[in-house]
């Protein structure tokens, strides 16, 4: 498929929230240990202290290091919103990610969710095929809709992934697409 058709398809996605300013934050400290809720809150408050007053972050996973179990209470206490990353590789890991997201929604509602990204750079790295990513996007969307969450669900990848016609199925499955530059 030609670039123009892919670009037109991507352009047809809704742009109601076309831009977020935030930081990607991992669940591990520099020494490899997992962040505690207090450490998440400290990180969120540091971001708010920047001249840009950053109040949104992106996580890479939900279950690793109890990411959401520790980050969501900190996000709520600091008024930080999260672009939730759900790891899409490895079915067992993906299922654990979904459960961690459901647990966080059950415990804290969904006001802290900006949107949900299923996978990150999977297409660029060729870690998963496009049909698998599309299926997992639809799976997560169905799961969160079943508990009343209306957050957009999509995928983040490099620009080269978005202009590759083989990945059209992912664009079609997504409420939004994100780009790592």
Residues covered by each model-derived region:
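Fungal secretory targeting signals
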Residues: 1-20
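Loop/turn elements at helix/coil->beta-strand transitions in domains of secreted/extracellular proteins
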Residues: 51-56, 77-82, 109-115, 147-152, ...
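Active-site groove signature of glycoside hydrolases
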Residues: 107-129, 156
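Aromatic- and acid-rich polysaccharide-binding/catalytic face
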Residues: 114, 120, 157-181
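N-terminal carbohydrate-binding/catalytic regions of secreted carbohydrate-active enzymes
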Residues: 20-104
